Amino acid sequence: MNYMPGTASLIEDIDKKHLVLLRDGRTLIGFLRSIDQFANLVLHQTVERIHVGKKYGDIPRGIFVVRGENVVLLGEIDLEKESDTPLQQVSIEEILEEQRVQQQTRLEAEKLKVQTLKDRGLSIPRADTLDEY
């Protein structure tokens, strides 16, 4: 096989269905329509998939432009195996509510952890107070 360097290897994947994981944790699924030398992507018929436990929900997003530096993972979806998932699809409202509850639970657990460490004389700096320079 003759492999092309860099993002040129993605040319073969144009017009195929892909899953894209972003740095902020979002998961996008759509058809790859265009790429450039910086790995910027244009996805068509895109949905944002939200997973909570064994359930998932899809939020339609349409055409989606993704800046290359925000892509963590890009993978082609096998259309034959796509429907063979153990996950249950639920409505957008239901999955958003479950996601909110999950995030609230994580936040409360993090606060408890920080308080416990503080009581023992330890402290962990919060991520939002750190400089990213």
UniProtKB/Swiss-Prot annotation:
Residues with Phosphoserine modification: S123
Modification Phosphothreonine, positions: T129
Keyword hit for Metal-binding: no
Location, primary (coarse class): cytoplasm
Subcellular location: Cytoplasm; Cytoplasm, P-body
Pfam family membership, one: LSM
GO molecular function list: RNA binding
Chain ranges of the Sm domain: 5-80
Keyword Ribonucleoprotein: yes
GO biological-process terms attached to the record: histone mRNA catabolic process; mRNA processing; negative regulation of neuron differentiation; neuron differentiation; RNA splicing; stem cell population maintenance
Subunit structure: Interacts with SLBP; interaction with SLBP occurs when histone mRNA is being rapidly degraded during the S phase. LSm subunits form a heteromer with a donut shape.
Function of the protein: Plays a role in the degradation of histone mRNAs, the only eukaryotic mRNAs that are not polyadenylated. Probably also part of an LSm subunits-containing complex involved in the general process of mRNA degradation.
PANTHER family in alphabetical order: LSM1, U6 SNRNA-ASSOCIATED SM-LIKE PROTEIN LSM1
Family: Belongs to the snRNP Sm proteins family.
Listed name of the protein: U6 snRNA-associated Sm-like protein LSm1
The species this protein was found in: Mus musculus
